[in-house]
């Protein structure tokens, strides 16, 4: 009797790497999108921390008046920010090797572009990674679709808006007070509060918060008890169990009596589809509002739209908002010679009819 033994060739290093990358047994799934996501997000995070702590002032307006944003230059957690790239750079791609020196790159706000572009690439890969893991587990792809909403919003304020305005200096600063400054200036220049897409976005965010609170409270109030009265209801459930953990019929009946019958869902799939759809569509509209206003397709202007029989203006909320916008825009302009267009375009008013005499 003859036994034949065949020696099985060991898998190549590349094949083992591919198997490990795409394995769903890893504690954290990596995936092919993760191969790009991990280094880009690590780069963005590392540069952000270093720049937030120690970056020198940046000439954001391109007028040789640098603005300090880091902690070592006198800021705190609230006032600190990564200052956007200089207006002198515009929307040019500005990597380190395009500058004459590292000092010049820092002075012109190079870290902002580095952080933003790596961040956007990283979170885009995170979308792909969500889809990839869902695909390998046999799940449907809607998790990745939902995550496109915040990514679209980030791309709108960090990339689309600077492109539309012609300079990365118009992008949103990476900091708390910088975000608020961006919001105020955006309102002053584009009247975002009167843009219908932004209004839909507000409805999406606040409505999503309301629906989330309603759903969570209804579920936790209608749990199916699997334990005795002397034991916590939480002990009656196992992670991944097939049985329902709450009684949707009871929740539906409660809410139907609280509001009216057709205000509640009696189908779990349609309920959760609605809970996912509402905020996602709202944030999509918010991203579209910023993207359209990037090219100066601004909010509605109803200024001085109500007049009396004598032609005198009756101020409405739109006029009050317009006055606030003008005030914010004036405060924003750091150049005395660079007035906002809507202030500089009207006829000049004489403030002195006689030149003052200067003695001595």
Swiss-Prot record:
Q: Which residues cross the membrane?
A: 29-46, 118-133, 142-156, 197-218, 274-288
Query: Site described as Tyrosine radical intermediate, positions?
Result: 161
Indicate the annotated site residue(s) for Cleavage. Answer: 344-345
Q: Which GO terms describe its biological process?
A: photosynthetic electron transport in photosystem II; response to herbicide
* EC number(s) reported in the record: 1.10.3.9
Q: Name one Pfam family in it.
A: Photo_RC
Record: residues binding chlorophyll a PD1:
198
The residues listed in the UniProt record as binding Fe cation, with positions renumbered to this chain, are 215, 272
> In chain numbering, where does the site feature Stabilizes free radical intermediate fall?
190
Q: Where does pheophytin a bind?
A: 126
Q: What else is known?
A: 2 of the reaction center chlorophylls (ChlD1 and ChlD2) are entirely coordinated by water.
Question: What is the designated name of this protein?
Answer: Photosystem II protein D1
Taxonomic path: Eukaryota, Rhodophyta, Florideophyceae, Rhodymeniophycidae, Gracilariales
């Amino acid at each position: 009797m003859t036994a034949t033994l065949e020696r099985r060739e060991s898998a190549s290093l590349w094949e083992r790497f591919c198997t490990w990358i795409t394995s769903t047994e890893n504690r954290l799934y990596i995936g092919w999108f993760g191969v790009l996501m991990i280094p880009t997000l690590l780069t963005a995070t590392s540069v952000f921390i270093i720049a937030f702590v120690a970056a020198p002032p940046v000439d954001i307006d391109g007028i040789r008046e640098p603005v300090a944003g880091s902690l070592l230059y006198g800021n705190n957690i609230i006032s600190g920010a990564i200052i956007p790239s200089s207006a002198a750079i515009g929307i040019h791609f500005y990597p380190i090797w395009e500058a004459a020196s590292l000092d010049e790159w820092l002075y012109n706000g190079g870290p902002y572009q580095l952080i933003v572009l790596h961040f956007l690439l990283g979170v885009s890969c995170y979308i792909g990674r969500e889809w990839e893991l869902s695909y390998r587990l046999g799940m449907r792809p809607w998790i990745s679709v939902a995550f496109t909403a915040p990514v679209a919003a980030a791309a709108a304020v960090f990339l689309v808006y600077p492109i539309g305005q012609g300079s990365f200096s118009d992008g949103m600063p990476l900091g708390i007070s910088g975000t608020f400054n961006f919001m105020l200036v955006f309102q002053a220049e584009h009247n975002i509060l009167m843009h219908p897409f932004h209004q839909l976005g507000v409805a999406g965010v606040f409505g999503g918060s309301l629906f989330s609170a309603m759903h969570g409270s209804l579920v936790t109030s209608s749990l199916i008890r699997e334990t005795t009265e002397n034991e916590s209801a939480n002990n009656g459930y196992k992670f991944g169990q097939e049985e329902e953990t709450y009684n949707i019929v009871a929740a539906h009946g409660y809410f139907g009596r609280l509001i009216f019958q057709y205000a509640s869902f009696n189908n779990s799939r349609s309920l959760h589809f609605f809970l996912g759809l509402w905020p996602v569509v709202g944030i999509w509209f918010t991203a579209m509002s910023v993207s359209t206003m990037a090219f100066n397709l601004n909010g509605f202007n109803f200024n001085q739209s109500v007049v009396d029989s004598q032609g005198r203006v009756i101020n409405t909320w739109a006029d009050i908002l317009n006055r606030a916008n003008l005030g914010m825009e004036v405060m924003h302009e750091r150049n005395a010679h660079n007035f906002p267009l809507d202030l500089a375009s009207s006829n000049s008013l004489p403030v002195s009819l006689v030149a003052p005499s200067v003695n001595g």
